[in-house]
């Protein structure tokens, strides 16, 4: 127990979208807001970038530890265009909005320890198999050929500039 009860170095969390709750009549959490009218991912999840501002802010205030996004991203219907490239503008927009909110948290003093995109490459997902694409790099499942999507180039630029272009 002594070994596994050491203090945490940081708090990490996978975050994809916000869920707003309120106390129900029995005191248990009840979903309070439906995100009708919000943009959605290919699997119907609402696009709520402000969650990358409020979640790190809340968690740092509560736990006093640096905060890390251990997974954030979206499913999209991606394909290789006639130019041989993958133009996943929805994912670029998603990342710009979410990383912009994350940057705002840093500017407001939240100690951010990192961000990991979901996922580097299109892959097998337990809930969706190969039917959805989550990666920054397109995977041709028949040939295993990889093609950088526009979102990969966008994220590369974010990393190179430490988010200055957000």
PLM regions and their residue ranges:
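Non-catalytic scaffold segments within catalytic domains of secreted glycoside hydrolases
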Residues: 1-166
């Amino acid at each position: 127990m002594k070994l596994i009860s050491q203090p945490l170095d940081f708090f990490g969390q996978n975050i994809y979208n916000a869920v707003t709750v309120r106390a129900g009549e029995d005191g248990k959490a009840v979903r309070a807001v439906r995100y009708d009218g919000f943009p959605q991912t290919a699997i119907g999840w609402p696009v709520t970038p402000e969650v990358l501002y409020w979640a790190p802010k809340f968690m740092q205030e509560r736990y006093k530890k640096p905060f890390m996004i251990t997974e954030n991203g979206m499913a999209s219907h991606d394909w290789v265009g006639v130019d041989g490239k993958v133009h996943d503008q929805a994912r670029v927009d998603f990342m710009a909005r979410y990383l912009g909110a994350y940057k705002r948290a840093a500017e407001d003093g939240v100690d951010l320890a990192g961000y990991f995109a979901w996922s580097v490459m299109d892959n097998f997902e337990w809930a969706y198999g190969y039917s959805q694409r989550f990666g920054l790099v397109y995977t041709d499942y028949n040939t295993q050929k990889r093609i950088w999507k526009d979102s990969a180039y966008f994220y590369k630029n974010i990393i190179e500039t430490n988010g200055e272009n957000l």
